Swiss-Prot record:
Species this protein is from: Bacillus subtilis (strain 168)
Active site positions, chain numbering: D68, E137
InterPro entries according to UniProt: ClpP/crotonase-like_dom_sf, Enoyl-CoA_hyd/isom_CS, Enoyl-CoA_hydra/iso, Enoyl-CoA_Hydratase/Isomerase
Compartments in which it is found: Cytoplasm
Identification of the protein by name: Bacillaene synthase dehydratase PksH
GO CC annotation: cytoplasm
Amino acid sequence: MDLVTYQTIKVRFQASVCYITFHRPEANNTINDTLIEECLQVLNQCETSTVTVVVLEGLPEVFCFGADFQEIYQEMKRGRKQASSQEPLYDLWMKLQTGPYVTISHVRGKVNAGGLGFVSATDIAIADQTASFSLSELLFGLYPACVLPFLIRRIGRQKAHYMTLMTKPISVQEASEWGLIDAFDAESDVLLRKHLLRLRRLNKKGIAHYKQFMSSLDHQVSRAKATALTANQDMFSDPQNQMGIIRYVETGQFPWEDQ
């Protein structure tokens, strides 16, 4: 593998395992266009290499906290009224779900909003005991249109519905009971190594054929794509929602709080 320097992620290869670490400590590990582009670049490289396992990791305190409101705010202040399409992010999650490698989310700390898209899209999700999971979008008049097809596929409609409406974090224990997390332990690094000991034995061709077969059994995510992208763009282009985001970034106040 060629040595490449990235702005938003750290990447390392260890035999047949690729580790992608979200690394935006200055932005609470939120998602921006560069992070999406860089992750797609690495996954494309993994597809044509000997990589059989891709591990996603974050910072110790936050795995991924969703959309970068600061970046969205800057776009709005520059006069951009129409929100950009989230198709690259949706495609990234679909690659994690269907690509010819086993994908693992190794979660420590907080996961919010779009961060749940990563967790839901991966084949396996493990965590330590500090992990928590939330969907905060409705607090801003939004909803997780692009996350929901992946989350519903993972934990079912009602639990995803409940998480969306309540907007509050669930613990790693609840996440495990709901099937969002497959395994958790205080020593999640050890837990990850145990998983990799088994997964390293799988060959790439077998993984690719199996994941193609699994994808053929359920077309929910691909069918929902156009509807989810349209809904997301409409929400982020709505003037009232934009004002709520601007106010939150400038003052730290939520939409329901008094001026």
